[in-house]
């Protein structure tokens, strides 16, 4: 039996020697065939077990593929948005493990030991040493091993790789290919002293590495300015030239997009996009969700009771106004608009007011309909709108209140009697005072006297016939008659004259 050169093989089969007798050769051949049969059975058993393990893994992978395909098929016809969260950056449930060897290495060979134990002890005892031929003695040859065939250069490189550089890879430290990415740097990730490799470098290389490191740190501290700052005055060269569409904020056309999109394949229909403005409000009041509600103003409503028939036929009837609040009630029936200067209403008679009983307050919310065609039907009517302030009426009121220099009253020329003979017309330049028109006439006479330069108004008018004609055209002021009309009639005549 010779030692096999394949030291890493777990199986060894004995070879039949050529210097054995016939009986020993038969026994040795039987043992070798038995060992070969066991070896073949063991090899195929290991192969079958490995195939079974691989088949189970493939079946698990197929099951995972089927489950994933079923999920995908379920999502194909769905119209709902689905969020998928990965468990990790690279989702994987198990850690990579080294693949088990199909034929593991064995330290001892139990088959060969069993074969050696089964050999008969008296195999070679039947033949004496003298019977053996000297030619059958074992012949030894000197054979060089693999280690002795290495050249000195290869051995030196191996030693250099073990000692210099980053060193050899640890036996149990590298478990996957991504772990080798740590060797892209100049630092040995598995060593305790990370700066040990620097001491083994030549001094020039050390200075070069130091200068490069300082340059890198300097570049990291201050990066070059961007193109927009370095060349802000120059325009960027575009392949299309200056013909670019740059709409303003309000010049871009509005795209008419429907609110509900049609049935599109592969598009979810329950997606909701919230604008950024709504997510981050700017108004400080939106930060407080529950704001206290302000109390309502306590305004009472106003009830006006009129006769239903009088309101329908527009016949004035007794009206009793009861003002309780400051704000008018909602409009339900609009009365006829009064004239712009509303005259003061006559005082209602006390007998009618006392005879009409005061009905209970009628609800004014909502539309109010007459309950019955009785003479006194409560209707909810608003207060008449206040008269608009007219600047002309204000001016007339101011003029009436002034009344000229001596407090005279203005009269309409139509109200003056036609048969009254005015003595002031015969008196040329006679000073007539008492009302505003007379004062204006006197002022005009003084102005004419100042223009003509004469001290006597009679001489000024006598020497100028044109002025005499103008003075004749201007009507003389009308003198008010005492006790003719009351003050109310005077005010009405004044309004008629100026209107």
From Swiss-Prot:
Q: Does the keyword Signal apply?
A: no
The record ties this protein, via Pfam families, to:
WASH_WAHD (PF11945)
Which InterPro entries does the protein's record reference?
Answer: WASH1, WASH1_WAHD
Q: Which UniProt keywords apply?
A: Actin-binding, Differentiation, Oogenesis, Phosphoprotein, Protein transport, Transport
Q: What happens when the gene is disrupted?
A: Lethal. Larvae die at the transition from third larval instar to prepupal stage.
- Keyword Repeat on entry: no
User: Which superkingdom?
Assistant: Eukaryota
Species of the source? Drosophila melanogaster (Fruit fly)
Q: Where is the composition biased (Pro residues)?
A: 333-363
What name is this protein filed under? WASH complex subunit 1
Limits of the WH2 domain: 391-413
- Tell me how this protein assembles: Component of the WASH complex. Interacts with spir and capu. Interacts (via N-terminus) with Rho1 (via N-terminus).
Q: In what ranges is there compositional bias, type Acidic residues?
A: 490-499
Role noted for this protein: Acts as a nucleation-promoting factor by activating the Arp2/3 complex to induce actin polymerization. Participates in both linear- and branched-actin networks. Functions in linear-filament (bundled F-actin) by acting downstream of Rho1 and regulating actin and microtubule organization during oogenesis. Nucleates actin in an Arp2/3-dependent manner and exhibits F-actin and microtubule bundling and cross-linking activity in the egg chamber.
Q: Name one GO molecular function term.
A: alpha-tubulin binding
Which family, according to the similarity comment? Belongs to the WASH1 family.
Q: What are the start and end residues of every segment in region (Disordered)? A: 317-433, 448-499
């Amino acid at each position: 039996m010779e030692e096999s050169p394949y030291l890493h093989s777990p199986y060894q089969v004995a070879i039949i020697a050529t210097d054995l007798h016939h009986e020993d050769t038969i026994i040795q051949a039987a043992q070798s065939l038995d060992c070969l049969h066991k070896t073949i059975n063991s090899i195929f058993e290991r192969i079958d077990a490995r195939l079974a393990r691989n088949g189970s893994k493939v079946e698990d992978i197929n099951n995972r593929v089927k489950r994933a395909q079923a999920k995908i098929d379920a999502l194909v016809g769905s119209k709902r948005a689905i969020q998928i969260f990965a468990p990790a950056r690279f989702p994987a449930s198990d850690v990579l493990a080294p693949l088990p060897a199909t034929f593991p290495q064995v330290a001892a060979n139990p088959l060969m030991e069993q074969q050696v134990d089964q050999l008969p002890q008296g195999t070679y005892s039947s033949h004496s040493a003298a019977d053996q031929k000297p030619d059958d003695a074992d012949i030894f040859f000197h054979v060089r091993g693999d280690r002795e065939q290495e050249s000195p250069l290869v051995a030196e490189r191996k030693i250099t790789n073990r000692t210099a550089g980053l060193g050899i890879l640890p036996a149990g430290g590298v478990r996957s290919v991504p772990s080798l990415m740590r060797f892209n740097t100049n630092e040995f990730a598995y060593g305790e002293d990370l700066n040990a490799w620097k001491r083994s470098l030549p001094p020039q290389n050390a200075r070069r590495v130091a200068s490069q490191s300082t340059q890198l740190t300097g570049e990291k501290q201050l990066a070059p300015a961007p193109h927009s700052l370095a060349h802000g005055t120059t325009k960027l060269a575009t392949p299309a030239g200056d013909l670019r569409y740059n709409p303003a904020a309000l010049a871009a056309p509005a795209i008419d997009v429907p609110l509900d999109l049609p049935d599109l394949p592969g598009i979810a229909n329950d997606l909701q996009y919230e604008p950024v403005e709504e997510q981050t409000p700017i108004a400080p009041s939106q930060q407080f969700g529950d704001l206290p509600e302000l109390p309502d103003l306590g305004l009472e409503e106003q009830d006006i009771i009129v006769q239903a028939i009088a309101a329908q036929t527009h016949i004035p009837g007794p009206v009793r106004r009861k003002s309780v609040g400051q704000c008018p009630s909602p409009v339900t029936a609009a009365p006829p608009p009064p004239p712009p200067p509303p005259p003061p209403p006559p005082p209602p008679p006390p007998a009618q007011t006392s005879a009409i009983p005061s009905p209970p307050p009628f609800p004014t919310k909502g539309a109010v309909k007459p309950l019955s065609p009785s003479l006194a039907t409560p209707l909810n009517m608003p207060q008449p709108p206040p008269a608009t302030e007219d600047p002309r009426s204000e001016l007339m009121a101011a003029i009436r209140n002034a009344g000229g220099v001596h407090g005279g009253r203005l009269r309409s020329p139509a109200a003056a009697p036609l048969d009254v003979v005015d003595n002031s017309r015969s008196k040329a330049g006679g000073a007539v005072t008492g009302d505003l028109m007379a004062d204006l006439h006197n002022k005009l006479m003084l102005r004419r006297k100042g223009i003509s330069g004469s001290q006597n108004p009679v001489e000024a008018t006598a020497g100028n016939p044109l002025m005499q004609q103008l003075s004749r055209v201007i009507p003389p002021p009308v003198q008010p008659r005492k006790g003719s009309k009351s003050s109310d009639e005077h005010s009405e005549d004044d309004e008629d004259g100026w209107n």
